[in-house]
Amino acid sequence: ELLATYGEKLVGGEDETHFGRPQDVAFLPDGRILIADGLDNNRIMIMDNDMNYLGEFGSEGSGPGQTNTIHAVAAGPDGRVLVLDRSGGRVNVFRTTDDPAEFAFERSIGDLTLPLDIIVNENDFWITDLGPLRFVNFDFEGNLKYTWLVPRELPDGYIEVHTFSVDPDGNLYGGDNQYGRTQKFVPKAGSDAELLIEPPWVGN
């Protein structure tokens, strides 16, 4: 059952009720909804849990907190919000403030080629990147922890991991929009837990 529709089909815009090719959605523990209105508008729209517009942050550019193409957004611990700048090759980290319509820029992380998606965990985060195709693991200070290269030619290879997630049992799912398939990977017995991607962070 369709409950509501926001925006207008084939009608783009940059006001409070229209979008410019939005790419992703994230949910904050207090119920606010963040919409990555990113291909045309390079902004994160802030909505309450009834989808009323509260404000927005972000703009186009290469300066602090700016983006060239927002492709993903994710919420994390301690009020963090991570915004993935695909064309800018980095992740911008913001923090919530006492004002529900304001977010404070903290830092940019990564020297990436073409980042596509992000999962935030309790102490770090993972990104899929192209050139070479890989999963990249950073802590919240921006320190590189681990790089996991992804094969292309094997039967279970990828051209790009356009989106990915992990279920409560630790199984990894990766969607490839070039090969047109999603694959499931189960952790090997005895795997180092520090090198495994955890399920996305969920606030209390």
Range-by-range predicted roles:
Residues 1-204:
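Eukaryotic scaffold repeat domains enriched in small/polar residues
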